[in-house]
Amino acid sequence: MMFVYVISKDGQPLMPTSRFGKVRRLLNENKAKVLKRCPFTIKLLYEPKSLVVQEVVLGQDTGSKHIGTSCVGNDRVLYQSQVELRDDIKSKMDGRRQARRFRRYRKTRYRKPRFLNRKNSTKLDRLPPSVRHKVQAHIDEIEFCKKILPVSKIVLEVSQFDTHLMKNPSLIFETIKHWGYQKGFDYGWASKREAILNRDRYMCQICGKKHTRLEVHHIIYRSNGGTDDENNLITLCEDCHSGIHNGKVVLFKKIKRLNLKPATHMSIIRSQLLNVYPDAIETLGFVTKTNLENLCLPKSHYIDACVIASGGKTFEFNDTIYQKRRVPKGDYQLTKGVRGEQKIPIGKIQDFRKFDKVKYFGKEYFIKGRMSSGFAILMDIFNNKIDFSYMPKGYKTPKLSNLERISARRSCLCISQRIIPSIA
């Protein structure tokens, strides 16, 4: 069941309604106005005789890539959403850093190098931009729900991971637990290089040579996202090492990848959310899994959030889910710089920007790209390009003049989808 969310005259959230006829009459009689189209929210322009709100519980399934959020009241799902987070922040900042360094090399070639002069790096409790985005996305979704619904309680599914134990499961034994956390892979060695050579028995791992000059080689290069982890390092002789870089030797060794970034991010997200919402109730993943199995429900982020908010009790499903995706706020490279009396570009072509929500032949899309010739490339909320090859001639590539803009670009794209949840 789809709901219309209601805000009182003084800005306080009220219980949502499914009486669309009454909402239509209020809008026609100028007793209410539209605040938001997705999700559809109205604000009353008069004081009702009585304001009664019920208890609404907000449940959130925290995550490093996706967030599931649900609000449950009177054993009914009043709101449910699934947010896809950004994963391009680090790569974009790496590109910025590379361009900045190359620019300074060109512009100030003979100037003494400067480094460690960033004020932001000296801030107390500073978070990396990629982690800060994920924490802020969780907070934004909670605050959004509190604006449209009278949330009285917050339940968070959070987790805390022991990354040392994930890398070395033997730390679970009491006999080595008290000292194992202080002794890593290269403990007792002067450098990681010596530890790698000792692990590989001072022998080339391709040809088996010994008693020769040995090199420690990155299996996945640092330029391709490789790390200095011991699983990514291998011992090679000088001939095999130069042969790999010359393309004459192929390294077939597979590394055991243990990606600990999501686990680290989840631990940080937990601590930050509990600092912002100290009254929130914590729950764990195995509790949600048990409740899902008891209710015979499939695994999904928004269904997990519904189970978290309901506390494992039965509830009435909502057939509307709000799919959201976080995107950059703007294309800043197009709008910055000293320009004198030149007009500052705003990144618009015929009043359209990238990520604008538009309507084309009755369906809603987002702008993926624009052409100065007046055409556009459209996509869905999951960044999939829409193919219009089935359209008649003249409409296979959408024209900007045929598009109707629904909403301007925002940092969070949103679209409503009708679903039929499978409870088999």
Regions found by a protein language model. Give the residues of each.
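Short metal-coordination and nucleic-acid-contact micro-motifs, chiefly zinc-binding Cys/His arrays
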Residues: 4, 55, 197-201, 212, ...
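Gly/Thr-rich phosphate-binding beta-strand-loop-beta motif of the actin/hexokinase/Hsp70
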Residues: 54-73
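Charged, flexible boundary elements
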Residues: 13, 17-51, 185
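A short macromolecule-binding patch
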Residues: 79, 383-400
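Histidine-centered nuclease catalytic patch
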Residues: 205-238, 242-249
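Substrate-contacting helices/loops that form the catalytic groove of nucleic-acid
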Residues: 51, 72-183, 187, 251-354, ...
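Short beta-strand-centered aromatic/proline hotspots
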Residues: 356-357, 363-377
